[in-house]
Structures are given as structure tokens and as C-alpha cells.
């Protein structure tokens, strides 16, 4: 079990900083529409989200609404975004199955709420919308802010080889993403060789539990909110489809493997074999016993050089430094490494018997700029749900 710990130490102990959030009520204890502001649960909540990460948060809110022991949520309604899928995004699917009222952005309904909750929503919220909620809008963000602000924090956590990550519950500010005060923050170690999808599953449960904890003591949590540090700010922009094209001459074997772990569940890494696009489906680290093979030592080979290693039944591809193993690929159909050798590599060697072996290589696939913009398969957290 991964045990979370506080990201920010004990500096806040014994202190009760001035609340940097929107005041929960006017002097008369009423919100802008004349309704009396609640000072304790149960809360009326509007949830805005899209993907599997967000669905876990919605599930926790739903369970809190229907809880018999302690009534934390009185009212729960949902906002999601349009989807090309007929079934809709995971949040919409869950809302419909659970018979929760659901709206499609920019429609947010016309009901009265105490607090808004956002998770993986990907839309900037206006100040006018934020001010409709007496307690503002909370964001469940899967990173330790201010590291990895933006729409793809989990992907960038894996892509950059972070060993520690976490979840931040923050209060939203208008006009910019992920800059508001931190209400709660916890860290966990990143499991070795974890994919973005696997890490998302861990963080989604942590974030859902943290949100429920904040809602149980909402006024106090808001009052104890702290500004994000000015140091350590990094950004997690969406990742374009072109990122999936392996640059053998520029990327190390570790970088290629991290790229596969980060986006391989969403879009496979791609390369070029004799002018044909090849998708690399199953990439693995090459162990020392394989690297000791005489075929791989004592000769200089060009990055992209590919050879079939019969004992391990893998394709071995040379990177900028070192080798990466490939167990399966896709051309017109999915092929094992052995299938690829029998159907393509062996035929190349027969046809080019006098060529230097280093000419048998994968080359970097370069997508036209227009194609990248057209497909704009921009990868963010919500893409993990597709």
C-alpha cells in the first residue's frame, strides 16, 4: 500500500493564515442571490469533469451523498463536455447510470450550490461562474503543485521520470490554470515502470479521498489555504501526435522507454521501416545478459539499427545510447517480433546480402505539420480514458 504524506512539511502547524479564498458569505450570512450560506454539511455540489480520474472523484461524491452514517452531500449535479464517442466520456456515463442530473458545457444548469468541484475538466472557468458558489470551486489536480500545472500532469510525471508525485486540492482562480491556493496536498512514490494509466488509477483514488476530507471541514480548509510556492513551477502542456515518433538519433533508450510508458496506452510509438509506418506496441528494457551478446558488442551501429535476438524473441533497436527491446509491432496487422523478422527482416537480408547490416534500420517518422494539426491528437489526462 502506498502511504501518502504531506508535501509541504510542518511550517503551517500552529498558524492560521488569513484566508485567501473568496469569503463564504456576506455580512448578512447570505450569498449573492439572497440564499443563506451554509456553515457546515451537507453541501450542494456541482461537479465538472470528464475522464476516469474525474469519475473516481464523482463516485466518491455520489457515495457521500448516499451515505447513511454522515450526510456530507445533499445535492449533486454534473457538468461534462461534448464527446465524439456515442457513449460519452466516463463522467457522463457514470452520471447517467447513477441517475444524476448532467449538463453539457457551457450549460451549467441554474440550480443553487454551495461549492463547485473540478477534476480533469480542461476548460477555463470565468470569474462570474466562480462567484456563483459561496465557497468557490475546488480542483482535484494530480500533481504536487506548482510542479506540472496544466492539462497533462500525469503524462509529464512519467515522461520526465519523476520518482515522487501526488495530488493537490486547490481553490480555482479565474483566467489561469492551477494557480490558486492549496488546501491539501499529499505525495506518493511513483511505482517503478508505471504507465500513465496505472498511475492515474492510483492518484484518482487518493484525490477522491482527499476531496472528501476537505469537504468535511470546508470552511476551516479554506481558511487554512496557503499560496503556491513561487519556486519549482513547471508546466504540463498537451502532447502532440508527433511526440509519438521516436527520434532514434536523439533519444536514449531510457527516454524511449519513458515515452512508451507515458503515452503508449493512448497512442503507440511510431517509426519508419522502408517507407512504411510501424507502430511499436510492446517495448521493454534490455537486460545485461542480452547486452552481452557478441552480436551487439564490438561493432559500431547507427541509431535505428534493428536486429532480431532469437534467444529472447525480441527485436533490439539501437538508440542514441544503448538498446531498447520490442516484442510486438503493427504494420497492416499486429506482429510478434518473430513474425516481423520472418516477414520483413529476413527478406531484407536475403535481398541485400552485400549491404552493411547497419543499413537495416528504423528511421524517424516525421509527420507533416498540417497532419499534426489536423489529427491534433493532443494528449492530456482525459486522453487516458479514450
Curated annotation (Swiss-Prot):
- Gene Ontology CC terms, in alphabetical order: mitochondrion
Q: Where in the cell is it found?
A: Mitochondrion
The family assignment reads:
Belongs to the Fmt family.
InterPro entries assigned to the protein according to its UniProt record, in alphabetical order? Fmt, Formyl_trans_C, Formyl_transf_N, Formyl_transf_N_sf, Met-tRNA-FMT_N
Q: Give UniProt keywords alphabetically.
A: Mitochondrion, Protein biosynthesis, Transferase, Transit peptide
By its UniProt entry, which CDD domains does this protein fall under? FMT_core_Met-tRNA-FMT_N
Q: Does the keyword Transferase apply?
A: yes
- What's this protein's name? Methionyl-tRNA formyltransferase, mitochondrial
Q: Record's NCBIfam families?
A: fmt
Enzyme class per UniProt:
transferase
Described function:
Methionyl-tRNA formyltransferase that formylates methionyl-tRNA in mitochondria and is crucial for translation initiation.
**Comment text on domains:** Composed of an N- and a C-terminal domain. The N-terminal domain carries the tetrahydrofolate (THF)-binding site and the C-terminal domain is presumably involved in positioning the Met-tRNA substrate for the formylation reaction.
* Catalytic activity entry: L-methionyl-tRNA(fMet) + (6R)-10-formyltetrahydrofolate = N-formyl-L-methionyl-tRNA(fMet) + (6S)-5,6,7,8-tetrahydrofolate + H(+)
Q: Give the species this sequence originates from.
A: Mus musculus
Alphabetized Pfam families for the sequence: Formyl_trans_C, Formyl_trans_N
Example GO biological process: conversion of methionyl-tRNA to N-formyl-methionyl-tRNA
Question: Could you say which EC number(s) this protein's record lists?
Answer: 2.1.2.9
Example of a GO MF term: methionyl-tRNA formyltransferase activity
